[in-house]
Amino acid sequence: MPAPTGTDHPDITVTDSLGEHDVARARLMVDGAAAADGISPLSEQAVAAIDAAAGSGVRHVISAAGYANISPGRGDEPAMIEAVVDPQLRRRGHGRALLTTAFGEAERAGDARVWAHGDLPGAQALAASMGLVRRRELLQLRRGLGTGAPALPELIVDDSVRLRTYAGSADDAEILRVNNAAFDWHPEQGGWGAEQIAERVGAAWFDPEGLFLAFDAANPERLLGFHWTKQHDTELGEVYIVGVDPAAQGRGLGRLLTLAGLHHLAATGRSEVNLYVEGDNTAALHTYERLGFGRYAIDVAYGRPEGD
């Protein structure tokens, strides 16, 4: 299918950066859609990118009725579009016009996809009307930690592993090494640099006691894996990132690190925990389901059918 061109909505603007007024307008639309739908229309990264400076690589598509941003693809990975339409202006063709423009921009450099967070009926219908198909699924899993929830298995650390929490920037190089080895295939998680670590360490939710590091007892300087937890509010925690060095696979480190984080989140008083996992990552799904997680929601990336 050729890249879409043109639009019947001439007020749509494409730019490398947004002015202060447009940043505020985009954030209001995101907040309004989240309140209306019970789920944010944009990911954490896409929300942060709303006020990204020119030169960041992010492209913005904005109109009076909607907003989208385009994150460029890395290597063979597609560009990713995230979009929102003002809830009060839906079903008037604005979503289609916004995505037509966004795909037209994104596909100049290759393949592109658009996230539908929650895969709501309106998003499904819009995707179908544009000839888009499901190309990727990201599952949100949840389990309880509070009263009435299944008890967590005991945390048992093998003598071959040294488990501790984050000790500061001296740990960053090993975290980056393991992260980029574990997620070299991942469009968002792979290819991190020091700025990605600094951004998260500087976030309001960051807690060094919630970042678990597993080192090799025989080589204490070598990181085997890590688990970064996140606390969203007083009730909900998150298994944010679990990364294991591919060279250390098969030692049960994913389960160990996940369990360490779950015990920590339970100790902070969180009553529920969530995580995100690729829909086709059967090994990770099996691990999480054995730890009591169940499916809660789904995000779908829609794109052109393969071969178009």
UniProtKB/Swiss-Prot annotation:
SUPFAM superfamilies: Acyl-CoA N-acyltransferases (Nat). GO terms for molecular function: mycothiol synthase activity; protein-N-terminal-alanine acetyltransferase activity. 1D-myo-inositol 2-(L-cysteinylamino)-2-deoxy-alpha-D-glucopyranoside binds at residues 44, 188, 230, 238, 276. One of its GO terms (biological process) is mycothiol biosynthetic process. Its EC number is 2.3.1.189. Gene3D superfamilies: 3.40.630.30. Keywords: Acyltransferase, Repeat, Transferase. Monomer. Belongs to the acetyltransferase family. MshD subfamily. Signal peptide: none annotated. This is Mycothiol acetyltransferase.
